[in-house]
Amino acid sequence: MRIVGGFKRGKNLMTPTDEKTRPTSDKARESLFNILTSMLMREDKNWSDIVFLDVFAGTGAVGLEALSRGAKESLFMENHPPALKCLKTNAADFENAHILMCDATCPPFTTRPVQIIFMDAPYREELWEKALTALKAKGWLDEETLIIVEIENSEENILPAGFHLTDDRSYGRNRLLFCRLNA
């Protein structure tokens, strides 16, 4: 597993040996960031405008990829000890990488919504819906925030009340749901 783009391209990332952590593949990350970069260009924005939140961060590969591509800051929410150990090691070479050791279904309050949220919860545990609702309640997102949720293809994409789907992409056995908060 490695960073696939930006100034840290090719940097190898440490991954835990446990079965619980399932990093987003290099191919899916590369596709995701091609989509995000295109979206930013259409909205006349740059990566340097973006505060990125990687929820259920695991190794931190997605949030670190955002930093490698020039994001202003990446925040990581993780509470699984083996994943945290890898995340801390992987993030050590990056400025503006901030780890929040917390349960994403009960995040801390913030008064500063982020621009992009990526969420890759353990499959079939119904955690992403709870986390999305909690992030909304605790101030992490607003109508401008783009949310990407990685789920297994067989999972239903029933968004919590107050959110709408803007895109849905399949990558092997995984899907990426792109959504926003209703205005």
Task: Give residue ranges: language-model regions.
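Class I S-adenosyl-L-methionine-dependent methyltransferase catalytic core
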Residues: 1-183
